[in-house]
């Protein structure tokens, strides 16, 4: 064995020096006596990383706390039934972290390690759309809040309840070094306040308990949106006061706001009298009950339904579904009823047609961020949660139907069934174009995927806008969990985190979660693959790898032609080539089963079949498919 060179430190010499140094600290006169009897707020624990943050030699403090405030915070969190805590670890909530995993046993909530706050928040977004309730997202001060902000905005636009807990060091006198100052704020929730429903900064543990329960109730009352509570580090780390009698508030869900009875009766009259009513559903079905109630209303009236699919509102193979011919349905309509439609202005109707909106969005709105769309002209506006109002509307409709109207409805339903089938056949014909093309057409990819999952209890946990909505056109969807809609705010980076979060929610139900993943979107948040592998979250990811930000390719092409310059250089700044990204290897590097890239459509079915078997064993898998642009 070679001897250490002069000036180098041998292993034994290093260990002797380290041991001697430790002994000197422990045996120093007065070391224990100098320890404070009562820990200051935000007492600094002896962590080695502190040296890197402050540039000073770390000190060892002999301070213990039998019951920190964060233990009580965990009691509050558990009382609300949070299953998961999505987070990237950080010191502004180190006490809450420790209390969750030790005092709370890392159960309900279980700590899910995320590589970025945008991933954590996106996972909570997807989880809530399956489970129907929030997960907890804990983020680190100023920087964590800003990292999470895009995903918070997506959830806000999508009307999804996400519960954020923000760490902070409010007391400036107790901040330890330059990093603590940079990561603290007077008002740490300020960056996201324009796109959350409510927030608070509690000053005591009782205040924390009441505001946390209040925030949960507000988030879960339609229109549902994200909320935030600041959990100050001092409040977490300071011991519970001697003899403290803290009260645990009782959470009682608020009944969703229902429509005024007179307005509901008027809408029922309009629906029964209309010749060609169209029911337009957008974010209607918050739960499986919403889908069932819309089916009952449509069947009762034999009315056309257009599902805008930001939730799974209506079965795709139901004969009254006219989603594949929405423009024609609108053109024929003498009454259009929008049920939680975000952009009712964009639903075109013929002159003289009656228009009715029913949405909880009329009960709450922000002003700075313009997600509320253009102001629509309507003849009747019902400010209410549509899902909660549908039962009374159905009963009001049934009371008004005469035998003559029932016969008319049956005839109308037969005609709609034919147009539905004709539209479905047209979609199948369109899907056959470029069937054997390489790269693979998005229609062929969707069809091959459907062939491998249709006999399973499956759940499509991704947006499908950028694959031309082929799954919505071709697949038989009739359960609420079959599709979770899009991102809401169209922020790039939503797809993979939301899919992983939704897959985690689906896991306990034994469902096969399927993610059709855009390539550029994945590159914002590849660390979500590691989270899926680390926590054994079964998710099948099929890459839509067109090696470009193709939406922007088209935008640049449009501008180039508009400016009279030709579109040949539109690939500059928009392509993901040279080098091409190998997503299978990327997945493998994160511990995920990866196959591909696949460019021959004949190889796609077998590759998906192998990946499905991996997912059914409880692990994530990814198949990289080279695809046509759309």
Residues of each region from the PLM?
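Conserved short loop/turn motifs at secondary-structure junctions
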Residues: 282-286, 433-434, 518-520
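N-terminal alpha/beta PP-like core and its mobile active-site loop of ThDP/TPP-dependent enzymes
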Residues: 7, 16, 20-401, 510-512, ...
């Amino acid at each position: 064995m070679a001897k250490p060179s002069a000036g180098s430190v041998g292993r034994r010499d290093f260990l002797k020096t380290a041991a001697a140094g430790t002994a000197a600290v422990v045996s120093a006169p007065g070391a224990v006596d100098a320890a404070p009897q009562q820990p200051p707020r935000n007492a600094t624990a002896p962590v080695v990383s502190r040296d890197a943050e402050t540039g000073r030699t770390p000190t060892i403090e002999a301070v213990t706390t039998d019951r920190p405030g964060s233990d009580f915070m965990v009691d509050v969190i558990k009382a609300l039934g949070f299953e998961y805590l999505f987070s990237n670890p950080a010191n502004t909530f180190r006490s809450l972290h420790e209390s969750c995993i030790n005092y709370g046993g890392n159960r309900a909530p279980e700590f899910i390690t995320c590589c970025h706050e945008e991933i954590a928040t996106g996972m909570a977004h997807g989880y809530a759309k399956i489970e129907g309730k929030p997960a907890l997202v804990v983020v680190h001060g100023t920087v964590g809040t800003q990292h999470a902000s895009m995903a918070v905005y997506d959830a806000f636009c999508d009307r999804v309840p996400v519960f954020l807990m923000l760490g902070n060091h409010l007391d400036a006198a107790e901040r330890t070094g330059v990093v603590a100052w940079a990561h603290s704020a007077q008002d740490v929730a300020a960056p996201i306040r324009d796109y959350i429903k409510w927030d608070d900064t509690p000053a005591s543990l009782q205040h924390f308990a009441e505001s946390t329960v209040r925030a949960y109730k507000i988030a879960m009352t339609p229109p549902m949106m994200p909320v935030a509570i600041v959990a100050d580090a001092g409040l977490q780390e300071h011991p519970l006061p001697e003899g403290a009698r803290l009260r645990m508030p009782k959470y009682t869900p608020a009944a969703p706001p229902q429509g005024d009875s007179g307005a509901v009766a008027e809408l029922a009259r309009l629906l029964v009298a209309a010749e060609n009513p169209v029911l337009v559903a957008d974010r209607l079905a918050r739960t499986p009950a919403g889908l069932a109630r819309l089916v009952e209303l449509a069947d009762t009236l034999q009315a056309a339904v257009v599902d805008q699919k930001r939730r799974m509102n209506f079965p795709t193979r139901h004969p009254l579904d006219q989603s594949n011919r929405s423009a024609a349905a609108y053109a024929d309509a003498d009454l259009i009823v929008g049920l939680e439609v975000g952009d009712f202005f964009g639903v075109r109707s013929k002159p003289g047609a009656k228009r009715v909106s029913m949405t909880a969005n009329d009960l709450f709105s922000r002003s700075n961020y313009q997600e509320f769309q253009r102001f629509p002209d309507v003849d009747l506006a019902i400010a209410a949660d549509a899902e909660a109002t549908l039962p009374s509307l159905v009963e009001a409709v049934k009371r008004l139907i005469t035998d003559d109207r029932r016969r008319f409805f049956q005839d109308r339903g037969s005609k709609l069934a034919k147009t539905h089938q004709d539209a479905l056949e047209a979609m199948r014909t369109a899907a056959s174009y470029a069937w054997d093309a390489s790269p693979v057409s998005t229609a062929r990819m969707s069809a091959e995927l459907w062939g491998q999952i249709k006999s399973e209890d499956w759940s499509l946990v991704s947006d499908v806008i950028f694959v031309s909505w082929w799954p919505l056109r071709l697949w038989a969807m009739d359960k609420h969990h079959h599709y979770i809609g899009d991102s809401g705010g169209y922020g790039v980076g939503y797809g993979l985190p939301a899919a992983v979060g939704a897959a985690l929610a689906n896991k306990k139900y034994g469902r096969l979660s399927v993610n059709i993943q855009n390539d550029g979107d994945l590159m914002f948040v590849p660390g979500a693959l590691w989270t899926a592998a680390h926590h054994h979250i079964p998710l099948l990811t099929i890459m839509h790898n067109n090696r470009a930000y193709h939406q922007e390719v088209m935008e640049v092409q449009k501008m180039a032609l508009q400016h009279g310059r030709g579109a040949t250089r539109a690939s500059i700044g928009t392509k993901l080539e040279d080098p091409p990204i190998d997503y299978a290897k990327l997945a493998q590097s994160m511990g995920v089963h990866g196959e591909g890239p696949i460019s021959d459509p004949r190889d796609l079915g077998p590759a998906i079949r192998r990946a499905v078997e991996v997912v059914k064993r409880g692990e994530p898998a990814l198949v990289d498919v080279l695809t046509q642009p759309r």
